[in-house]
Amino acid sequence: MLSAPGFHHLHLNSVDPAAAIDFYARQFASTSASSWGGLPALASPNNVLLLFSKVATPPATTPQSAIWHFGWHVTDVRKSLGAYKSRPDVKLLPLYTTDEGGSVPISSDTWPPTGSVLGLTRAEIADARAKGVTPKGGSGFAYLQGPDGAIVEYQGNQPVERMNHVHMWQEQPFCAQLWYRKHLNASLVPGRAPASPRTEENCRVERGPDRTWPALVPEGMFRTPTAAVIFGDVMLTWYMRQDDTLLADTRGQLYDHIAFSVADLDAWVAKLRAEGVTFLREPYALGATRAVMIEGPSREAIELVEMKG
């Protein structure tokens, strides 16, 4: 079996890549301006990149595609929040605590979750209120708005500051997990393996009926089912799409595609072609190397970049 790819980059479209890179480098001190394949980039210390293409008009963020936002580990989330509050060019995104109104800047400033789901339903919030449950404070997750309308999560407290995930929507998260494992040899996230292993016969499920909070939208969000895989130390983590509209093609939007590194592109092309995977672009030159682009289970564009040695 071919070795699992590594996470190489998240490709963003931007009206001003240099300004975007400068913004991110100021918010995450461990990162630095770089370039790769002739394109401007932001380098994270775990050897992954945000890669940028310059576009003439602001990139679209609607209709919703499979890519929702990307996230960073930080060592002290409240220290980061304090720094961001002092910077006029940083817009913090509120986490709404109920559909009645009210918001907090960090998830741990509202009622804590009671299980593996990172939020509470209306009924669970009512129960927490009745029992006098109070926020735990401390570490948690929070969001800021990046250039071009990007949503950026910062999560702590973690040992090292680095890019750590791309949060996505999927038509069927369990089926997506199977797809990434079958076609791209992805690993399950340690500690997050499904309690009951899914197969292609039973991976399709109904979306959970209850919205949960905290959430980036006042009406709350559906957090079940959820699934994830990991490439190197970068997770792809998924919730089911939030409405009845099919997810759009990522290409040309703000979050254009995700990219993985492979050692032998020809071997991967042969494997994926034999498995009936959809190719969006046949092998093409990319900087000093080659790449192909395939389509994921919810129309996300996935680039495979050959990185020999």
Where are these regions (language model features)?
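Mature N-terminal segment immediately following signal peptide/propeptide cleavage
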Residues: L2-W36
